[in-house]
């Protein structure tokens, strides 16, 4: 039975929602196994270990985010050829994307292993947290090939409208991650590196499952191992669409690393508290993330099929839904912040910092939803450079300049 979803026909709202639902569930489970690290580490290994995991998070996103941005650009190219029903071009785009992922995963592994200590020191990671941060970071990047290839394969499946299989495989890998976390840390008494090891193993599991499915599917997007190679024309298109998205992710990550370095200056309790909030924010923003992913695929497929009016109507629907849902969630986070933060670590200082972070940001989720959805529409239409420039000005120039000045004038983490 055909599991992909053509966005070029049928009810616009139903197509977007039905595609977004498995994306939401998949991202929910992904957040669950990311959060499992923090919950288990925080409760079994203490605040130092939790701070180590938290301090590595933005740095990991910096290095992985660029690669994932390229994968997003590849997804736009694949979705457009799928919508246009150009099988040969679709095949070349898919196999070039996989070849790129293999090369990028190898480079990322080497860079992550060697650059970890220097970057963590530059971020101002406290001396008592630094050793565990390095262990977590290096262990994670030793398995970064699984992380990269999982995102590549999922990007291929989602670009042709298949959200069901990534969901199934992600549920399996999430269960593997949680079981391994408990076994390594609670059962064997292993340290913080075992949390990263559990995540890496689970990502490899999901990547392998996605790859096997793509090799077995009887569709025009079938993966053939012998066909994995670079096609210069496709690589150029992928880079043109992907580099702006990758750079955008890196800009956000660089700004977050800078913010993290300022958080580090407030001590390990602030690091743990703000790290706990970041996990909550990951859950809170899931609906918006799913609508942005669905919008990019919807717009790409419809533009490929030259259904321009349908693409516009879908974009308007997705943006409006995201804004409403995001603000409702923000209100809930604001009200329930103390209980949510305490789930990660009950230390009063950790909860204090986490609640401050939550209540400073939560009510502005609607603005984030609007900007992310507009960026998704622009990416889907092949104008990825526009959100890249906006993010560069907003997240990097304005945000970093503001923090540099504000923290020195008002030494309060809420600024």
List each model region and its residues.
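Transmembrane alpha-helical core residues of multi-pass small-molecule transporters
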Residues: 57-60, 104, 172-177, 198-206, ...
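Residue-level signal for short hydrophobic patches within transmembrane helices
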Residues: 9, 13-32, 36, 59-66, ...
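Transmembrane helical elements of multi-pass membrane transporters/channels
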Residues: 18-37, 139, 150, 173, ...
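Structural signal for membrane-spanning alpha-helices in multi-pass inner-membrane proteins
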Residues: 112, 155, 181, 185, ...
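Helix-terminus/linker motif at the lipid-water interface of multi-pass membrane proteins
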Residues: 28, 32-51, 120-127, 183-190, ...
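Short alpha-helical transmembrane segments in multi-pass integral membrane proteins
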Residues: 1-20, 78-145, 187-243, 299-364, ...
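Small-residue-rich hydrophobic transmembrane alpha-helices
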Residues: 50-110, 147-166, 260, 274-337, ...
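Hydrophobic transmembrane alpha-helices of multi-pass small-molecule transporters
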Residues: 62-65, 109, 177-181, 207-211, ...
């Amino acid at each position: 039975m055909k599991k992909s979803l053509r966005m070029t026909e049928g009810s616009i709202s139903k197509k977007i929602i039905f595609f977004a639902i498995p994306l939401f569930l998949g991202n929910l489970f992904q957040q669950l196994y990311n959060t499992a690290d923090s919950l288990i580490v925080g409760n079994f290994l203490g605040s130092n270990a939790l701070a180590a995991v938290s301090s590595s998070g933005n740095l990991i996103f910096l290095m992985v985010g660029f690669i994932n941005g390229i994968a997003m650009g590849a997804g736009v190219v694949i979705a457009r050829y799928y919508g246009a029903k150009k099988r040969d071009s679709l095949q070349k785009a898919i196999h070039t994307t996989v070849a790129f992922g293999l090369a990028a995963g190898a480079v990322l592994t080497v860079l992550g292993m060697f650059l970890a200590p220097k970057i963590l020191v530059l971020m101002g990671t406290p001396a008592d947290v630094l050793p565990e941060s390095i262990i977590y970071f290096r262990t994670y990047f030793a398995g970064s090939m699984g992380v990269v290839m999982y995102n590549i394969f999922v990007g291929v499946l989602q670009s042709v409208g298949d959200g069901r299989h990534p969901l199934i495989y992600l549920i399996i890998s999430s269960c593997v991650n949680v079981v391994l976390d408990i076994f390594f840390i609670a059962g064997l008494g292993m340290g913080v590196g075992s949390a990263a090891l559990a995540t890496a193993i689970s990502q490899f599991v999901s990547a392998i499952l996605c790859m096997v499915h793509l090799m077995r599917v009887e569709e025009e997007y079938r993966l053939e191992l012998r066909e994995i190679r670079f096609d210069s024309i496709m690589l150029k298109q992928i880079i043109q669409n992907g580099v702006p998205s990758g750079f955008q992710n890196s800009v956000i990550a660089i700004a977050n690393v800078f913010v993290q370095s300022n958080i580090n200056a407030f001590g390990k309790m602030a690091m743990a508290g703000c790290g706990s909030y970041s996990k909550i924010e990951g859950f809170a923003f899931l609906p918006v993330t799913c609508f942005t992913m669905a919008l990019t695929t919807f717009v790409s497929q419809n533009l490929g099929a030259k259904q321009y009016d349908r693409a516009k109507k879908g974009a308007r629907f997705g943006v409006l839904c995201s804004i409403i849902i995001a603000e409702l969630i923000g209100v809930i986070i604001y009200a329930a912040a103390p209980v949510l933060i305490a789930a990660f670590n009950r230390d009063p200082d950790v909860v204090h910092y986490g609640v401050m972070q939550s209540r400073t940001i939560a009510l502005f989720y609607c603005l984030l939803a609007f900007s992310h959805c507009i960026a998704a529409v622009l990416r889907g239409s092949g104008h990825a450079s526009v959100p890249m420039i906006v993010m560069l000005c907003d997240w990097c120039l304005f945000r970093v300049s503001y923090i540099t000045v504000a923290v020195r004038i008002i030494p309060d983490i809420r600024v």
